[in-house]
Design a protein with these regions (language model features):
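Hydrophobic/small/kink-forming positions within alpha-helical transmembrane segments
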Residues: 3, 7, 40, 72, ...
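Hydrophobic transmembrane alpha-helices of multi-pass small-molecule transport proteins
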Residues: 46, 50, 117-156, 294-313
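C-terminal transmembrane-helix exit sites in multi-pass transporters
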Residues: 101-123, 133, 277-296
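Glycine-/small-residue-enriched transmembrane alpha-helix faces in small-molecule transporters
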Residues: 1-36, 73, 77, 81, ...
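Specific transmembrane alpha-helical segments of multi-pass solute transporters/efflux pumps
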Residues: 1-8, 53-93, 98, 134, ...
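Hydrophobic alpha-helical transmembrane segments of multi-pass integral membrane proteins
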Residues: 1, 26-49, 124-130, 165-173, ...
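Helix-helix packing/entry segments at the starts of transmembrane helices
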Residues: 37, 79-80, 94-100, 185-206, ...
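C-terminal-most transmembrane helix of multi-pass membrane proteins
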Residues: 35, 39, 137, 237-239, ...
């Protein structure tokens, strides 16, 4: 779901979905507004799910803790900052910054929760991070005009991106908030997923809305009219926007919430990079973006490095299921034996 963001965001905001030079059908704050829509749709869907599954009472009994609130607040602010960043700086920088999030999550979990992490898990995380750099053409052969180089430009301003430094700051914030959200989602594993999801998305709306409001306030105060929200969507744009809000909102972020609740931070963070190959596949199939040697290497590294925690989780799940069946069978046998003893 998260890997489909480039498809639906381009569909929902661009004047021409396949031509970035045509610009956007809105102002620079449109990214925060799109993130706000994703979170608002999440609230609607999880409220419907809560009523449909008869968990209103569970929601009322669930104690709202800082971890639940901050998990939602952080993801809302992260995605609002990320989409805004892609409009003000290079896509390479924006992607590089937000994908520091899983690494930040792992470090926070190691420091504050003392989660054990094996050398193999660290190796897998490093592999998928390097794979992300290759996949996004930030690192690799022929990058930056070199035989082998790194493309990471920290210039405060360029002719193409006059507000580049601001965009880089938004990108850095998106990574910090993303990592913090993943970290906070690892708490309160006892909380019902549906009930927690309602709270998460409510606070995510607050987070994304805060970024959108601040951009408008700063825009009006400094005279940067391009920061003041303007929307000129066509019917075609609205279809893409709604698909973004649904598929990349309650569906994708709901799965992210479930993963954070059930997986250790290291496995959670490693698997999070799998959205990169999905985005690259969308770029190839829909936008005819070429698959270079670097992107191929990136996909192989991400899939290979991410396979370990995925397979491990599947094996553990299978073992737990077998143990549960054995326990149930043993319990039935004991009950049968007890019944026979009573008959005697």
């Amino acid at each position: 779901g998260m890997g489909l963001v480039p498809l639906f965001s381009r569909w929902g905001t661009r004047t021409d979905m396949f031509d970035a030079t045509q610009g956007l059908n809105g102002s620079d704050s449109i990214g925060a507004i799109m993130a706000l829509g994703r979170m608002a749709m999440g609230v609607v869907f999880f409220l419907i799910l809560m009523v449909a599954t008869h968990k209103v009472t569970t929601f009322k009994k669930l104690k709202l803790t800082p971890a639940i609130a901050l998990g939602g607040l952080m993801i809302g602010m992260s995605l609002a900052c990320y989409v805004t960043s892609t409009l003000m700086t290079t896509v390479a920088n924006a992607v590089m910054f937000i994908y520091t999030g899983p690494v930040i999550c792992v470090l926070l979990a190691r420091i504050f929760r003392k989660e054990p992490m094996s050398p193999l898990q660290w190796v897998c995380l490093c592999i998928v991070f390097v794979g992300m750099l290759f996949g996004e053409s930030l690192l690799g052969f022929g990058v930056g005009g070199n035989a082998f180089g790194l493309d990471f430009n920290l210039a405060p301003s360029t002719p193409e991106f006059p507000q580049k430094m601001v965009g880089d700051i938004f990108g850095l914030l998106s990574g910090v908030f993303y990592g913090a959200s993943m970290f906070f989602n690892g708490y309160r594993k006892d909380a019902d997923t549906t009930a927690r999801g309602v709270y998460n998305f409510i606070f995510a709306v607050i987070g994304a809305g805060t970024v959108a409001i601040l951009m408008n306030v700063v825009g009006m105060a400094t005279g940067q009219t391009n920061w003041i929200t303007e929307i000129h969507f066509t019917a075609f744009n609205w279809v893409g926007a709604v698909l973004l809000w649904i598929v990349c909102g309650p569906i994708a972020l709901g799965c992210l919430l479930v993963a954070g609740r059930n997986l250790p931070a290291m496995d959670y963070s490693t698997i999070a990079y799998w959205e990169v190959p999905v985005a690259l596949f969308i770029g190839l199939v829909v936008f005819s973006e070429p698959v270079t040697l670097n992107t191929a290497i990136g996909i192989i590294l991400i899939v290979g490095g991410g396979a370990f925690p995925t397979i491990k989780a599947m094996i553990q799940g299978s073992k737990m299921e077998k143990q549960q069946k054995v326990a149930e069978h043993l319990s039935e046998r004991l009950e049968e034996e007890a019944a026979k003893e009573e008959e005697r």
